Amino acid sequence: MNQTPDQARPTPRAGIMDIDAYVPGKSAAPAGVAKVYKLSSNENPLGPSPKAIEAAREVAARLDIYPDGTARRLREAIAEVHGLTAQNIICSNGSDEILGLLAQTYLAPGDEAIFTEHAFMVYKIYIQSAGAAPIAVKETDERADIDAMLAAVTPRTKIVFLANPNNPTGTYVPFQEVRRLHAGLPRHVLLVLDAAYAEYVRRNDYEAGIELVRSAENVVMTRTFSKIGLGGARIGWMYAPMHIVDAINRVRGPFNVNATAIEAGIAAIRDRAHVERSVTHNETWLTWLSQEMTGLGLRVTPSVGNFLLIHFPDDQKHSAAAADDYLTARGYILRRVSGYGFPNALRMTVGTEEANRGVVAALTTFLKS
């Protein structure tokens, strides 16, 4: 059978190879580095709740049994803690799975979806995967600009993604502004509030989105267990109106949350003492790191997350790339963020006291060199 070169093997549909693959933060230092401090992925420096660890151990003997495909007990635990209705919750293999399912379900070729220019990179990936057009809106002072987002809405707009707080900047939108964004959207446009870092925010003008979801038919809120110590378990969840829950349940995998994740998640979200310890640790060291970095002459974007965006001088000797190489050689792994539009900045997760002090000491020496 004669074939043209294009027919010699399966090929992805149009547009797939135009997608830039997501590259996670690195996790290894060069060979010979005695101790590695991974500060590149916004993980919880206190680790998992001891109760979650024990719950994961207990389920090990039952791993031959499929998990509950609805994750009912996990949904009930989430509902109990947050004062929600369990039937309005869907659990997922990380919150990014939910983001992908929303794009898959509500976008089609020819549609548009909006996000801000420095937002979580997976939005663009999932929008393109659905065959839709990604529309990146300029930010103002590294914050979402609500007027600019509303101005970007066209008859083709179907989804607006808002990371609140945003990664990698750590900035947030006061909830009155979120409500203004929602009020300005056509009712058929879905507003996705990605509140992955909500646990860490202690501001009177911030809300994760629960009340807006309750009162609207076109708003969902997504959350994650990663920031409370279960990044490796991959647990996300969405709170949404029932008509959206129904649609997503039709396309999600039948056993998308595994048995270990379900049991660990139930224990973790009910261990409020561990969550509060995590938040207190973060508040203390986020403030300290911000002050120390500023004292070194580095600009820091004000953050309410569990990380800092640190901006470096323009001179090549003390650039972000040079700083990253210097820190990595000493076992401190930070995140380069060129792909987010910050070629001369590094994102640093708030770590343990030892890690935080070590990075500041290393940068002090680096900047004097």
Swiss-Prot record:
Enzyme class: transferase
GO MF annotations in UniProt: histidinol-phosphate transaminase activity; pyridoxal phosphate binding
Pfam families hit by this protein: Aminotran_1_2
GO process annotations (BP): L-histidine biosynthetic process
Catalyzed chemical reaction(s): L-histidinol phosphate + 2-oxoglutarate = 3-(imidazol-4-yl)-2-oxopropyl phosphate + L-glutamate
Domain of life according to the entry: Bacteria
UniProt keyword list: Amino-acid biosynthesis, Aminotransferase, Histidine biosynthesis, Pyridoxal phosphate, Transferase
Enzyme Commission number(s) from the entry: 2.6.1.9
Cofactor or coenzyme needed: pyridoxal 5'-phosphate
Pathway in which the depicted protein is active: Amino-acid biosynthesis; L-histidine biosynthesis; L-histidine from 5-phospho-alpha-D-ribose 1-diphosphate: step 7/9
Positions of modified residues (N6-(pyridoxal phosphate)lysine): K227
Family statement drawn from the similarity comment of this UniProt entry: Belongs to the class-II pyridoxal-phosphate-dependent aminotransferase family. Histidinol-phosphate aminotransferase subfamily.
The protein's assembly and partners: Homodimer.
Annotated protein name in UniProt: Histidinol-phosphate aminotransferase 2
Source organism of the structure: Mesorhizobium japonicum (strain LMG 29417 / CECT 9101 / MAFF 303099) (Mesorhizobium loti (strain MAFF 303099))
